[in-house]
Amino acid sequence: MSLLTFKGGVHPNDGKALAKDKAIVQVQPKGDLVYPMSQHIGAPAVPIVAKGDHVLRGQMIAEAGGFVSAPIYASVSGTVKVIEPRFTPAGSKVNSIVIENDGEYEEVEYSTPQAVSEMSKEEILNAIGDAGIVGMGGAGFPTKVKLSPKEPDKIDYIIANCAECEPYITADYRQILEHGEELVEGMKIILRLFDNAKGLFGVEDNKPDCIEKLKELTKDEPRMEVLKLQTKYPQGGERQLIYATTGRAINSSMLPADAGCVVDNVATISAIYRAVAKGEPSMDRIVTVSGDAVHEPGNFKAPFGMNQAELIEAAGGYKVDPEKIISGGPMMGFSMFTVDVPVTKTSSSILCFTKDEVAQYEPTACINCGRCVEVCPSRLIPSRLADYAEHHDEEAFTKHEGLECMECGSCSYVCPAKRQLKQAIGSMRKTALANRKKK
């Protein structure tokens, strides 16, 4: 049963008009490329090249470091300059391979892939794993692992997350409009892994052109359906999307597979098509650069490892000095202290905000208005959870389901007292989860 929406949520200014009509532009890096070994959930990748080695575009430079891991490929040709810790967009230092770009873009000779119709399920999964594909719309969970549930026959829905509900980001929107065929072909490949499953494309109703495009592409596909979802943040959250498209509910202790679902986003499914049908490893992605602080917001096809400062240059550079630069969306993304960091597998956007775009408020006392409760998609009481967090009361925080918070930021967005609810709850949630692992 498709409900097409969920309880709670908010309607922030979406800011998408800045970049939604800008076609995808291929950009080439100028300087060195930096490849962090941790661009995904799980074990870091392990370098298989050394300083001084010459590498080609499409060559594996790091292999998966375990079952839950993913290999990394060079996105340019050049020479390995050094392997050392470098900063990631999140601000942590991670062991990284630095490649000096020779500007030649010599590419490995890919072997002619086997016809998808002739491939076994194991061969399809291996192709996905070997390509280094991870979730490109969230935390970067290795896709081969996600597509390998213990009981595949119990999976009856493959959900393509086409919501792109975060404000400003238009990368998936442009991907669907310009390369929607890759998304549909990728869904066909995934459906070959799950005999009993149906493919659902969940698209918010503020993207009628995407809905029309996907309906046209799937009109002769009986195992696929395009669902027009109500526009509301965080419609693209995994739990909210599953509930809106299937009517099934999951909590933080469950995986989507426990509800018979697998969820992947537009970029990930498109990468699956290119890997399985064309033999191409995961080497680049679409990144939105937006915000009033840049001259020409747009959508760029950027190779992994490219310096994010170069992407901002591709968007015309700064119009004014930005007050804040965010990696990801303004609701769930994070502020960066430098743009001298690489584009990674999970880099969906770079948002450069002016002082006028950034809220500057001093928090005051809670007025018990209940707005945070009304908008919470996890049906929690954020004001109370924030109180527990501020008093370091982990027991009460856990007892009142604080671990169910998805840190969407809806509560902070509507709070008239401007309390930093998301930050307080998120901090305590991380502490509680870390302590749980120690037990």
Named regions from a protein language model:
Residues 102-127, 132, 137, 150, ...:
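Flanking helices and flexible, charged tails adjoining ferredoxin-like Fe-S electron-transfer domains
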Residues 1-48:
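N-terminal, Lys/Arg-enriched amphipathic/low-complexity engagement segments
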Residues 232-236, 240-249, 316-367:
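Active-site gating/interface segments in enzymes
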Residues 78-80:
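Conserved hydrophobic positions within beta-strands
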Residues 347-363, 373, 377-439:
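Ferredoxin-type iron-sulfur electron-transfer modules in oxidoreductases and energy-metabolism complexes
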Residues 196-308, 314-319, 329:
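Hydrophobic alpha-helical positions that pack around
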Residues 50-63, 82:
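Short, well-structured beta-strand-loop connectors
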Residues 177-192:
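Histidine-anchored nucleotide/phosphate-binding helix
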